């Protein structure tokens, strides 16, 4: 088998077009080779106006190779913030999902906190603070807890009573309910503890004198069972110069973020 040489047909117009294109390709290639020589000024113009388009420019705004100078730093920072914005948009819904609290429907439910019932009584010779909370055990019973903290002279009684309890001054205040009311009201004292400390300090009404003070801290726990509608908190306070009887009937079915405040 013989190989025959093919005749070369030269078209002047086509030859001139190929020659011009090859010249521009060589010129652009020289511009890219010159990029490694750190030439100022000419590098940016050659890359922008060249007909050769890098495939990476179809997806990224600038060449992935870092270039010295302020323009390269600005371009890299711009791409960094774009990437960070895209990552933030993706991760933000996931973060919100993680931060969503898990609601547990357990057996025990805390209805109120220590600040839900707050009573502060101040006189010349006594400073009294009473706080309370209610815990629903979920089995038809709930507990009522009280804490008393008093400084000075006086007697304090805090108890649970039915709404029919008459507010009146009694000769000897009792901290427990009567037998008939206990049976119909279904509430009883479960735990009670009182700590007392005696001390002397300067009198509030006359700092030049020394007065006898008694500091009392007590904890009382009531246990109630259903059926019940409304229970009331009954406070009886007796001192040498001041007497107070107060009945509070909060609505335990209404969960309010603002606690009940009573001051006298």
UniProtKB/Swiss-Prot annotation:
- State the Pfam families in the record: Neurexophilin (PF06312)
Tell me the InterPro entries matching this sequence: Nxph, NXPH/NXPE
* Summary of the tissues where the protein is detected: Expressed in brain and kidney.
Superkingdom field: Eukaryota
Q: Where does the protein principally reside?
A: secreted
Region feature (II): 23-90
Which is one Gene Ontology cellular component term of this protein?
extracellular region
Q: Glycosylation annotated at which residues?
A: 86, 139, 149, 155
**Record keywords:** Glycoprotein, Secreted, Signal
Describe the PTM: May be proteolytically processed at the boundary between the N-terminal non-conserved and the central conserved domain in neuron-like cells.
Q: Where is this region: V (Cys-rich)?
A: 179-264
Gene Ontology biological process terms from the UniProt entry: neuropeptide signaling pathway
Example GO molecular function: signaling receptor binding
Q: Where in the cell does this protein reside?
A: Secreted
* Entry annotated with the keyword Secreted: yes
Q: Does the keyword Signal apply?
A: yes
Q: Region III: list its residue ranges.
A: 91-169
Chain segments carrying region IV (linker domain): 170-178
Please give the function described in this protein's UniProt entry.
May be signaling molecules that resemble neuropeptides and that act by binding to alpha-neurexins and possibly other receptors.
Tell me what this protein is called.
Neurexophilin-2
Q: Which organism is it from?
A: Homo sapiens (Human)
